[in-house]
Amino acid sequence: MSGLTEFFRGDISRASRVALLVVALALIPCLFLPVWNIGLKAPQYPQGLELKIYSNELTGDLQEINILNHYIGMAEIEPDEFREFIFIPFFILRFLGFAVLAALVGRMPIAAIGYIDFSVFGAVMMFDFQTWLTRFGQGLASGAPLTIDPFTPKFLGVTSIGQFEVTRYPAAGGTIMLLAGALGPVILIYELVRRRRAAS
């Protein structure tokens, strides 16, 4: 236990500091690129419809998708209802700041706190996204032109809803964030191996 405590109190190598700077630089485009993509195919729209979720806004074929939502009794998507758009950009900047600070100072505690913060935020956002999807899928109004049973959409993958097929997957910004997050365990393993070799 004391060895593990000592590890998390120690310094990080130059290679890991460079990797953290790469993470910081990679997070900058996430402020401007779409994070998640929702695609929809329907008989009325054979070319498909698309919603792009950014860190601070929702764009795409919102009007047409709301028409289809009305067709099955689903509530309209109102971008102003998503309060998450207010604070997500600030969290991205916060993670960027942690990465830069850890790289400049070279201390494991800062890197560890930043990664834990990033991981918790990612888990909370996925849960939040799934909660919104469940609310829309389970809250179908009666008397809609097309009657379907309430359902729980998946935040990732393909869902068939009556005559519609809905796909959800990470867009460019989301992919970058996932890759940046994956560097955390890589840095941790690298530092563990480096410390053990130095101690032997």
Question: Which role fits each region the language model picked out?
Answer:
Residues 13-24, 98-125, 197-199:
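Interfacial segments of alpha-helical transmembrane regions
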Residues 160-190:
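C-terminal structured interaction module
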Residues 32-85, 130-168:
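Long, glycine/tryptophan/cysteine-rich extracytoplasmic
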Residues 189-200:
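Membrane-interface capping segments at transmembrane-helix boundaries
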Residues 24-36, 113-140:
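Hydrophobic alpha-helical membrane-insertion segments
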Residues 2-37:
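Hydrophobic secretory-pathway targeting helix
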Residues 4-14, 105-109, 161-172:
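Juxtamembrane loop-transmembrane helix junctions in multi-pass integral membrane proteins
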Residues 22-26, 84-109, 175-186:
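Hydrophobic alpha-helical transmembrane segments
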